[in-house]
Amino acid sequence: MTTVTRSEPLAVIPPPVPPHVPQIRGVRWRNAALTPKTLIVAAVAGIIAYLALVPLYYLLYGTFFDGTGFTTGGFGRAYGNGQIAELLKNSLAFAIGAAALSLTLGTSLAYLMVRTDVPFKALFFAGSIVPLIIPGILYTISWIFLASPDIGLLNALIGPLTNDAFVLNVFSIWGMIWVEGLHSSPIVFLLMVAAFRSMDPSLEESALMSGATRPQVLRRVTLPLVKPALLSAVLIILITSLESFEVPALLGLQDGIYVFTSRIYFVLRTYPPDLAAAGSLAVGLLLLAVLGVAVSRYLARGAKTFQTITGKGFRPRPMDLGKWKPVVGVVIVTYFILTVLAPLTVLMYTSLLSFYRAPSLEVFQSMGLQNYAAVLELSQAKTALKNSLVLGLTTATSVMAVMAVAAWLVVRSKIRGRSIVEQLSFVPLVIPGLVLGLSLSFVYLRSPVPIYGTIFILLIAYCTKYMPYGM
């Protein structure tokens, strides 16, 4: 008889544990830093820092240092002989006046467009944004043909009516404010339209039912609710007015009215160009822009202390203008004629003439397309069109590609120092365009990379200028 015994399972012997070798801290940091995500983030941060800071560094270096060392001689040449008071007065009057006009027009038009049953809404909207589409230099030239004291069409129309007692003069500080304010008002309009659309009109209705008057409701309810949008509009218009060049150059220089941008242009046009004096003027303009940002931030310190919440089915109800509707309709048509129809008409009229002449039957009979034919035959025109298309497409693609990664880094990631990337991205917003151009000239005049005077330096300038808008 065979006896079967139950055998015990064999014990599993674990493999020997290798001795613990502590990883060097630097190795761990290097392994974490060499991941693809980290490398991409570092590259984007480096590009943003280069675009934002390097031009400013070279601008300050070229302003305060020359071949002998540290110097402030450029400031003496730029602001000496009492020039600083005149520059500050003209620049602040121009910027503040244009901001006040554009803010008044843009906010009023946005309120009428969104919150009332204003007539001609399609015409109203077109008239409110078309000036933004017209390039600033063309818009300024159109107003020269309209309101010049010598050849202005408006003066030709109103002169016989007033017996030449009233003459429009666009070549003045008031003309500069008028043209810049009209051209900038669409920016305010677009910002305020969004603000008014998101505001609950029942708050205004409640105030009216409680006995408040319309001016009281506007001052105590409406404007406080849209205060953040108002301050954003003020900041943007102040900076764009300070950096404006076409309007001061075309309208101010003829009457000897200098602002910072036109003075920088004048200094650079002298021979030999005084780069230190131009840099000193650019530093002053930059300080003005930074001061404007600081004041705007100070005023906005309490702008986010409250908010309104509406349901999904919320739709703002338009306010009935009643007997004022025809009056508002006339105002809208007049505004459209002044800001859109008249400038475009005078540009078209002038383009069909061999040389400018006042309208008459003989002039209309001599109109032709010879100017357009001459432009199409110019090789420079084809090159300009090609360069414009290449710069537009390349700038938009490059900025969005880089800033999309930067926005993800700021919003979605947990990487330390991401707030620095966000702050660097908005540095070009407070750098006036002429200052940025001068800064880039300081950089690439000294650079061994031969891109000065090529399309690539324009690409770098555009990418730097529009970098904040992609964030």
Residue map of PLM features:
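Transmembrane alpha-helical segments of polytopic membrane transport and secretion proteins
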Residues: M1-A45, P215, S296-T334, R416
